[in-house]
C-alpha cells in the first residue's frame, strides 16, 4: 500500500499442481500487504487469502486500485465467511453478512450500528445512482435507530422529492416501509396495515399492488406469517405474487415467527416441486427453506427428504 492506494508491485505466472506449489521467483522478496492468488482471474477456481492478506483486506478493500483484484478479494472473503474461516463481523465492512453469519450478540452490540452508519453515509453521497443502491441495501439491514429515522424520511417523502442526491420514488418508499414494518417499528399490526393502505392509495400501479402484498407478508405477527405462508404454498398465486409474498415473509429473518413452519416445510416440499413450474418451485423452496432452524432435528428432516 502506497499513498493510500493498493497497487500491484509484482506478478508471477505459475502453474499450480498438487497441494503445494513453490514460487521460486518470490524467494527473498519483501512480504506484500496483500498476496492475491489468481490475480487477473486467469482460471476458474476457489481461491483463499492467507491470514495477513485477509486482515489487510478487511481494512483496505476499498483502497485496492484494480477493479478485478478488488472483485477477487470480495469473492474470496465471501467464500471464507460462508466456510467459517472469516468471522462475519469482519465482513460487514464490506457487504451485509450480519443477517445470517454474524454472532447475534455482536450484531446487537456493534455490528448493526457499524453497518447502518456505512449504508446511510453511502445513501447521503453525491452520486445519485450509488446513493440509491446504498438506500436499497439499508432496507435489508438490521435497523439501528439512525436507520429507522432515515427510512421514516423516505416513507414520508413525496414521490419525486429528493433526500440529498437521492430521488425518492414509490418503489423506494415501499422498500423503506416494508423494512420498518418487518422490524416492528409500527405499534401493532393495525398500525402497519394502516400505513400500507395509505401508501397503496397513493400508488395504484401494478408494482404498488405487489409491494403491498410484500409489506403485508412482512408484518411481524404469527398470524400474518401464517397467512403469507399459506398463500405462498397454495399454487394459486402468480409468479410475481409468490416472489413478493416470500420476500415479505422472510424479510429481516424473523426466525422466531417462522418456527411454526419448521416441520411443515419438509412435508409440503414434494407437493410444491410437483405442482409448481420448475423455476417457481425452486424459487419458492429456496426462499422458504427454514434456515432459521439450526437444530439437529432440522438436519434430520432435510436428510430424510433428500434420501
Model-found features: residue ranges?
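Long, ordered, helix-rich scaffold segments
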Residues: 2-7, 24-307
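Short beta-strand segments
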Residues: 8-12
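Short proline/glycine- and polar residue-rich coil/turn motifs
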Residues: 13-20
Amino acid at each position: 500500500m502506497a499513498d493510500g492506494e493498493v497497487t500491484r508491485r509484482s506478478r508471477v505466472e505459475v502453474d499450480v499442481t498438487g497441494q503445494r506449489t513453490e514460487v521460486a521467483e518470490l524467494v527473498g522478496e519483501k512480504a506484500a500487504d496483500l498476496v492475491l492468488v489468481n490475480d487477473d482471474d486467469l482460471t476458474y477456481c476457489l481461491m483463499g487469502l492467507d491470514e495477513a492478506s485477509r486482515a489487510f483486506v478487511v481494512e483496505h478493500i476499498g483502497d485496492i486500485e484494480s477493479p478485478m483484484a478488488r472483485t477477487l478479494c470480495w469473492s474470496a472473503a465471501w467464500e471464507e465467511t460462508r466456510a467459517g474461516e472469516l468471522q462475519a463481523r469482519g465482513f460487514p465492512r464490506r457487504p451485509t453478512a450480519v443477517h445470517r453469519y454474524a454472532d447475534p450478540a455482536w450484531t446487537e452490540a456493534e455490528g448493526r450500528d457499524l453497518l447502518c452508519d456505512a449504508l446511510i453515509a453511502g445513501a447521503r453521497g453525491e452520486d445519485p445512482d450509488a446513493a440509491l443502491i446504498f438506500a436499497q441495501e439499508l432496507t435489508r439491514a438490521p435497523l439501528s435507530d439512525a436507520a429507522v429515522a432515515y427510512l421514516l424520511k423516505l416513507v414520508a417523502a413525496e414521490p419525486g422529492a429528493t433526500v440529498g442526491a437521492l430521488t425518492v420514488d414509490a418503489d423506494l418508499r415501499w422498500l423503506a416501509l416494508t423494512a420498518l414494518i418487518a422490524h416492528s417499528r409500527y405499534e401493532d399490526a393495525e398500525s402497519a396495515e394502516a400505513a400500507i393502505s395509505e401508501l397503496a392509495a397513493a400508488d395504484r400501479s401494478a408494482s404498488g399492488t405487489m409491494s403491498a402484498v410484500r409489506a403485508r407478508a412482512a408484518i411481524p405477527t404469527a398470524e400474518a406469517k401464517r397467512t403469507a405462508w399459506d398463500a405462498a404454498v397454495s399454487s394459486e398465486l402468480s409468479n410475481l405474487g409468490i416472489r413478493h409474498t416470500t420476500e415479505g415473509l422472510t424479510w429481516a429473518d424473523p426466525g422466531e415467527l417462522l418456527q411454526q413452519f419448521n416441520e411443515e416445510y419438509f412435508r409440503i416440499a414434494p407437493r410444491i416441486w410437483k405442482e409448481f413450474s420448475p423455476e417457481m418451485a425452486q424459487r419458492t423452496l429456496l426462499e422458504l427453506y427454514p434456515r432459521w432452524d439450526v437444530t439437529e432435528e432440522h438436519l434430520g428432516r432435510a436428510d430424510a427428504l433428500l434420501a
